[in-house]
Amino acid sequence: MNLFDVYSLFDVTPVKAKGTRIWDDKGQEYLDLYGGHAVISVGHCHPKYVAAITDQLNKIGFYSNSVKNPLQVELAKKIGELSGLEDYSLFLINSGAEANENALKLASFHTGKDRVIAFKGAFHGRTSGAVAVTDNPKYSAPFNAHHNVTFLPLNDIEAVKTELAKGDVAAVIIEGIQGVGGIVIPDDQFLRDLRQATKEAGVVLILDEIQSGYGRSGRFFAHQWAGIKPDIVTMAKGMANGFPIGGVLISPEFEATKGMLGTTFGGNYLAMAAANAVADIFKEENLVANAFEVGEYLKNSIPASPRIKEVRGRGLMIGVEFNEPIAEIRGRLLYEKHIFTGVSGKNMIRLLAPLTLTKADVDIFIKALEDLL
């Protein structure tokens, strides 16, 4: 049997990782500024993280959600404290796409409606509902094409108000920062206006913080830069440092009923051990503040060059947009300078480093970039 061939792969085989470093099967060391696509939050193989999963596996690895699991309650408390959303409820699943699916379902339950407003450039996942609110037709099969979704220009509050006035909208879903769309940050005032407009219309506001959340932006959630409180927040990538997990934070206005949501693997013992360790490390090592400080240093250190059009982002979610395709320079960063980076579109290098990144790490990247420019 072969693997279903859907991924374009670099010719690198990682076998070991620690902190912000990765080693391949030939012993070559790399600086990781990609974080496995914004997943590695507390650094690779953090000793407290490794110990927590190992210890838990020696006790009990799995049972279903038909029994009490105190680790879930512990995680909810920690996320409430880290996020400032102590009065919200937590529903646990296994991925970001699942988080958005359940958020959309909750919104439809709550309002009795089915239309969703999403935004141009959005990416919310590849499962049925999530891909329906993703603005990229190549990800959507005919099976996914029957959802009632309206795409609007980002930051156009009047267009949103026009659609809300029709009275058939269940939810508006928006990313804290668009990642796949090119590190596009919604205007803070637009988010405040959007919160007010959805509240007045009785429409659920969903903030997709799967990539931009969990400290990556220099706030626990990127929407907190605008000072708003959504009805639902979805999260996943940084929650457990690579162990599959997702979460939905649900405001107190929503009433749970037995069976309305469910999952087999969500909230399992190993995921909870991993996520609780990550939450502890966030607090102990002040990683949200580090993401902001080192992210600002990184943005301000990018060299001026006629080849670079713009640098944008918040915290350690940064896009370096070039005036040309970046495939060559990204490949040279990997194979010559041994630095992992991400991409968005054809012209943008996307930097999604572990939140443990140091200024010394940044200096290594800047020197490499200057050499290649």
Which residues are covered by each model-predicted region?
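Conserved N-terminal phosphate-binding loop of PLP-dependent enzymes in the Aspartate aminotransferase
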Residues: 1-373
